[in-house]
C-alpha cells in the first residue's frame, strides 16, 4: 500500500513562554484559534500534510514549553528536527531579545545545517507593538534566515511561514533539484485562500 506522503519533516517551535507557539500550531494544523490555551506542559505535536512542489509533505510540528525549567525536555527534541521556528511576540521586547539565547540553544543542540525561520507573532496587536519590523529583519539578515510576522488570531502569514520552511527543507533534501530557491508563492502550499487586509510583513 502506497504511503500517504512523500516526505516527513519534523518541525520544532521554540521561544519564550506566552509568545503564541501553541496558538500558531493549532491555527496551522486545525485552522482554529483559542486565546485561553494554558502554558504547554512538556511537549506535544500536531500533524498536517501539505503539497509543495508536487510532493506530499507530512509536517510533524512540535510544540515546546518556553519556561527554562523545561529546557532539558526540549533539548532532546532538537536533534531530529529538520526545521526550527524561533517565535517572539511583537508586543514583548524581552521575548525578542531572548531570540539570541534560543539561537545559541539551537547551535548547541540541533543538527548542523538545520533550517531556521524567525517569526514575530501577534502582529494583529499593532497598537501594542514593542519590536519594530526593521529590528527583526536586521536579526534575520544577520543569521541568514527568513523572517515573517504572523497572527495566529487572524491567520495572517501562518500558512506562508510554515510553507516557506517546508519548501526550504525540501530543496535542501533534494526534493527538487532546481536552481530556483526564491521565496515561495502562495501557490506552493495548497491551502484555502484566506482573504484579509492585515499588513503583517513577510520576508
From Swiss-Prot:
Chain residues in the propeptide: 201-203
UniProt: Mg(2+) binding residues: 22, 40, 63
Compartment list: Cell membrane; Cytoplasmic vesicle membrane; Cell junction, Tight junction; Golgi apparatus, trans-Golgi network membrane
Superkingdom, natural source: Eukaryota
Gene Ontology CC annotations of this record: bicellular tight junction; cell-cell junction; cytoplasmic vesicle; cytoplasmic vesicle membrane; endocytic vesicle; endosome; Golgi apparatus; insulin-responsive compartment
Names of the cofactor(s): Mg(2+)
Binding of GTP, residues: 17-18, 20-23, 40, 66, 121-122, 124, 152-153
Activity control summary: Regulated by guanine nucleotide exchange factors (GEFs) including DENND1C, which promote the exchange of bound GDP for free GTP. Regulated by GTPase activating proteins (GAPs) which increase the GTP hydrolysis activity. Inhibited by GDP dissociation inhibitors (GDIs). Activated in response to insulin.
Expressed in which tissues: Highest levels found in lung, kidney, whole brain and spinal cord. Expressed in all tissues tested including Sertoli and germ cells (at protein level). Also detected in osteoclasts.
Region (Disordered): 173-203
Lipid-bearing positions (S-geranylgeranyl cysteine): 200
Listed name of the protein: Ras-related protein Rab-13
Originating species: Rattus norvegicus
Higher taxonomy: Eukaryota, Metazoa, Chordata, Craniata, Vertebrata
GN (gene name): Rab13
Amino acid at each position: 500500500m502506497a504511503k500517504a506522503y512523500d516526505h516527513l519533516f519534523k518541525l520544532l517551535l521554540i521561544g519564550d513562554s506566552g509568545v503564541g507557539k501553541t496558538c500558531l500550531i493549532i491555527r496551522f494544523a486545525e485552522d482554529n484559534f483559542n486565546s485561553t490555551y494554558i502554558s504547554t506542559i512538556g511537549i506535544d505535536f500536531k500533524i498536517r500534510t501539505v503539497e509543495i512542489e508536487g510532493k506530499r509533505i507530512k509536517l510533524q510540528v512540535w510544540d515546546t514549553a518556553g519556561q527554562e525549567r523545561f529546557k532539558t525536555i526540549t533539548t532532546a527534541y532538537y536533534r531530529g528536527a529538520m526545521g526550527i521556528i524561533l517565535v517572539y511576540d511583537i508586543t514583548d521586547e524581552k521575548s525578542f531579545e531572548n531570540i539570541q539565547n534560543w539561537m545559541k540553544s539551537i547551535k548547541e543542540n540541533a543538527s548542523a545545517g538545520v533550517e531556521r525561520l524567525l517569526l514575530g507573532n501577534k502582529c494583529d496587536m499593532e497598537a501594542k507593538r514593542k519590536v519594530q519590523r526593521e529590528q527583526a529583519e536586521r536579526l534575520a539578515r544577520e543569521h541568514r534566515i527568513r523572517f515573517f510576522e504572523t497572527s495566529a488570531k487572524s491567520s495572517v502569514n501562518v500558512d506562508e511561514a510554515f510553507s516557506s520552511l517546508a519548501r526550504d527543507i525540501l530543496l535542501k533534501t533534494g526534493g527538487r533539484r532546481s536552481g530556483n530557491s526564491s521565496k515561495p508563492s502562495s501557490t506552493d502550499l495548497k491551502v484555502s485562500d484566506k482573504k484579509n487586509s492585515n499588513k503583517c510583513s513577510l520576508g
